[in-house]
A protein has these predicted regions:
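A general structural signal for well-ordered alpha-helical segments in protein cores
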Residues: 40-41, 169-170, 196
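C-terminal hydrophobic helical "lid"/dimerization subdomain
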Residues: 189-203
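Structural motif
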Residues: 51, 97-98, 121-123
């Protein structure tokens, strides 16, 4: 796709339903960013490297919610939800690329994610980082505006595109044997959480916030 000019990662959930089922989502750290957005931010950092600064709008649309699960003993009862349910963020990466990261927990099930990279020569539509498998679609650029670009589904070029939850420990073992840093390493995980902390801080200050930590792009 040539030089990358921007990216977007957006996803939705239904926290009325999910927080009715999973009580831990009501606890500190169970908000839409910390519980769900980490998958998308980790994918962004894996592709583009560390985040330099962020500016965001974060809110909780419904601090009081009603249990919507008929089988639950709390069905129809009100419960407190004190975490963030929405976050809309501009990410400035250390490599100079800027993109958007948006998560909305006040929507519906099933989750519908958009993860797109825009380049000067084409566009990549990536799979949902919260799921396994899916198609990576390449949309080539056209020079004649009367022509319609023809999307192409790309071959992954490697195995383990489906449910492969043991892949991380397996790659870690290879990294230890080869004397290198594993891809899903602690520094990257810390940087992603640090980025979310600054997203929360930016929503309070109304300004760009630098992300103090950094990491290597895997």
């Amino acid at each position: 796709i040539g030089e990358v000019t921007s990216f977007e990662a957006c996803a939705n959930r239904d926290l009325d339903l999910l927080a009715s089922i999973f009580r831990f989502l009501r606890m500190p750290g169970g908000g839409i960013c910390y519980d769900f957005g980490v998958y998308y931010l980790t994918a962004i950092v894996s592709l583009f490297g560390p985040v330099d600064s962020v500016v965001s709008s974060v809110r909780n649309l419904a601090p009081k919610r009603v249990n919507v699960v008929p089988d639950s003993p709390e069905y129809g009862q009100e419960f407190d939800y004190s975490n963030e349910s929405q976050a809309f963020t501009i990410l400035e990466m250390k490599n100079g690329v800027t993109g958007t990261f948006c998560v909305n927990g006040d929507s519906t099930i099933n989750d519908q994610a958009v993860f797109t990279i825009y380049g000067k020569k084409g566009i990549l539509k990536l799979v949902d980082p919260n799921n396994f498998g899916g198609d990576i679609v390449y949309i080539p650029g056209v020079k004649d505006w009367t022509q319609q670009a023809v999307p192409e589904v790309l071959d992954y070029g490697f195995a383990y595109s489906e449910n492969s939850r043991g892949l991380g420990p397996s790659e870690m073992a290879e990294a230890i044997a080869e004397g290198r840093l594993n891809r899903a390493n602690a520094k990257m995980a810390y940087h992603v959480l640090d980025t979310i902390d600054q997203i929360m801080k930016s929503a309070e200050t109304g300004a760009f916030e630098k992300v103090p930590s950094t990491c290597e792009r895997p």
